[in-house]
């Protein structure tokens, strides 16, 4: 049975989403290791990237198995969200023009606010302010994306438009999750949705980096 285009896109999104622990958790480890043994760090990074590409979700499996073996009880989704604000070199747009650097900055700002959710969610007043800050950061990122669209022409504009639509879709989904949270109080669903939005933010940068 052949998959529809939408199903293929959804599968691709799920596949890339499960690879989030590679750059959120392992990349900082590799960066630290580079100070000790550059060659070993580069070899290990390349091996993890190759393995993750061939077996999406492998990094997450390895991390959870280590935590289980050490009997460490941790909310992996929450921890991932806390760690996901860091810049990922592979996603940063390298073009020097101000619009592209602003794109990096606005994406970074949104990710940093989202990563604070676990610390703010139990304080209603602070969390409501965080929600307002997230809404502003989303708007600022989209405005910056539109500014880049206006100023620069792209052959592969469809890919950029698609990624922008995906980002908007996940932004709305995040908003819906928040509404549900205020009814059922399930913070985990907010963490999951925030991680997805961070992932979409990285994909916007990655798409611009690829076609720019």
From Swiss-Prot:
Pfam families: PDC10_C (PF06840), PDCD10_N (PF20929). Transmembrane segments: none annotated. It is found in: Cytoplasm; Golgi apparatus membrane; Cell membrane. The lineage of its organism: Eukaryota, Metazoa, Chordata, Craniata, Vertebrata. GO terms for biological process: angiogenesis; apoptotic process. Belongs to the PDCD10 family. Keywords: Angiogenesis, Apoptosis, Cell membrane, Cytoplasm, Golgi apparatus, Membrane. Promotes cell proliferation. Modulates apoptotic pathways. Increases mitogen-activated protein kinase activity. Important for cell migration, and for normal structure and assembly of the Golgi complex. Important for KDR/VEGFR2 signaling. Required for normal cardiovascular development. Required for normal angiogenesis, vasculogenesis and hematopoiesis during embryonic development. Promotes cell proliferation. Modulates apoptotic pathways. Increases mitogen-activated protein kinase activity and STK26 activity. It is a peripheral membrane protein. The keyword Cell membrane applies. Disulfide bonds: none annotated. This is Programmed cell death protein 10. It comes from Xenopus tropicalis. GO terms for cellular component: Golgi membrane; plasma membrane.
């Amino acid at each position: 049975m052949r998959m529809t285009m939408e199903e293929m896109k959804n599968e691709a999104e799920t596949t890339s989403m499960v690879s989030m622990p590679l750059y959120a958790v392992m990349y900082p480890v590799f960066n630290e290791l580079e100070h000790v043994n550059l060659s070993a760090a580069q070899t290990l990074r390349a091996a993890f990237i190759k393995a993750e590409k061939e077996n999406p979700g492998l990094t997450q499996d390895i991390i959870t198995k280590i935590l289980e073996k050490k009997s460490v009880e941790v909310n992996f989704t929450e921890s991932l969200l806390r760690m996901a604000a860091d810049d990922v070199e592979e996603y940063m747009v390298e073009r020097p023009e101000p619009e592209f650097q602003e794109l990096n900055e606005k994406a970074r700002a949104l990710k940093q606010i989202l990563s604070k959710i676990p610390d703010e969610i139990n304080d209603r007043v602070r969390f409501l302010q965080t929600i307002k800050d997230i809404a502003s950061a989303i708007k600022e990122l989209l405005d910056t994306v539109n500014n880049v669209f206006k100023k620069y022409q792209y052959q592969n504009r469809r890919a950029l438009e698609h990624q922008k639509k995906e980002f908007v879709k996940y932004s709305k989904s995040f908003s819906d999750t928040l509404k549900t949270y205020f009814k059922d109080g399930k913070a985990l669903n907010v963490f999951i949705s925030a991680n997805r939005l961070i992932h979409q933010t990285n994909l916007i940068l990655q798409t611009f980096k690829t076609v720019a």
